């Protein structure tokens, strides 16, 4: 099973991003696959980011942001997952001395995806997802699947 990270979707949403074309191409390459998992937590992050004027020069209005996210929820070939019983482990990790506070969302996302059987994870930040038990974590904008 394969999942993709928030950053790829945000790049695909932003026509001004240098990564836009490559991100769109990667996501479109997954459209007909039956082994894709989309996590609601990831889509929640997408919604927050594409509405944020600190991230996008022209943020999406609420209804357009929801419609953009709904497109990822509506692919009938893809599994949509919401949550998993991972929070005890997330809190254990978060309590570690050198745990960066912003990693808590990544930890929850990674552990949720692993709970649902995801083995391959595409992200532009592979180092942020190392150590969570994925078979492969890679940046599809710089290396092939």
Tell me what each language-model feature is:
Residues 38-44, 104:
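Aromatic- and histidine-enriched alpha-helix N-cap/loop-to-helix transition segments
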Residues 1-38, 53-64, 127, 131:
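Short, well-structured N-terminal submotif of metal-dependent ribonuclease cores
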Residues 8, 42, 86, 108-109, ...:
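Alpha-helix capping/helix-boundary segments
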Residues 53-57, 99, 139-141:
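Short, hinge-like loop/turn segments at secondary-structure boundaries
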Residues 1, 107-145:
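Acidic, PIN/NYN-like endoribonuclease modules and their adjacent C-terminal/linker elements
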Residues 77-124:
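Active-site neighborhoods of divalent-metal-dependent phosphate/nucleic-acid chemistry enzymes
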Residues 10, 24-27, 47, 69, ...:
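Conserved protein kinase catalytic domain
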Residues 48-80:
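Helix-adjacent hinge/juxtasegments
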């Amino acid at each position: 099973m394969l999942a993709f990270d928030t950053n790829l979707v945000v790049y695909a949403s932003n026509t001004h991003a240098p990564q836009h074309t490559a991100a769109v191409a990667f996501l479109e390459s997954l459209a007909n696959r039956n082994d894709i998992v989309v996590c609601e937590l990831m889509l929640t992050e997408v919604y927050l980011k594409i509405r944020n004027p600190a991230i996008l020069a022209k943020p999406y209005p609420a209804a357009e942001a929801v419609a953009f996210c709904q497109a990822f929820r509506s692919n009938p070939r893809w599994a949509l997952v919401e949550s998993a019983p991972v929070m005890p482990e997330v809190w254990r990790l978060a309590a570690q001395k050198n745990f960066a506070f912003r990693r808590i969302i990544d930890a929850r996302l990674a552990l949720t995806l692993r709970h649902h059987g995801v083995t391959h994870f595409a992200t532009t930040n592979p180092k942020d997802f190392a150590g969570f038990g994925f078979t492969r974590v890679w940046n599809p904008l710089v290396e092939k699947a």
